Amino acid sequence: MKMMIAVFVSILLLMFSLSSTAMGMETEQQNMEERADVDFTGIADSIIKKIKETNAKPPARFDPATFGENED
C-alpha cells in the first residue's frame, strides 16, 4: 500500500513538472513572437539590419580556453 502511494505521488510530481516546463516554453514562444512584431517605422534601415543580425546570432558563451596562459 505504501508503495502504491509513493508511485502515485511520483507520477503526480512528474506530471506537474512536465506541465510547468510546457507552460514555460509557451511563455518563451509568446515573448519571441512579441519581439518579432516590433514596429520599426521611423528607424533607419541600417539600425534595423544591425538589430536583426544581433538577434539572429546565438547567445555568447564563455570559453575558458581563450584565456590561456600567455607565453611571454
From Swiss-Prot:
Keywords: Bradykinin receptor impairing toxin, G-protein coupled receptor impairing toxin, Hypotensive agent, Phosphoprotein, Secreted, Signal, Toxin. This is Hypotensin toxin Ts31. Disulfide bonds: none annotated. Expressed by the venom gland. Belongs to the non-disulfide-bridged peptide (NDBP) superfamily. Residues 25-35, 61-72 form a propeptide. It is found in: Secreted. Its main location: secreted. Residues 1-24 form the signal peptide. GO terms for molecular function: toxin activity. GO terms for biological process: regulation of blood pressure. GO terms for cellular component: extracellular region. It comes from the Eukaryota.
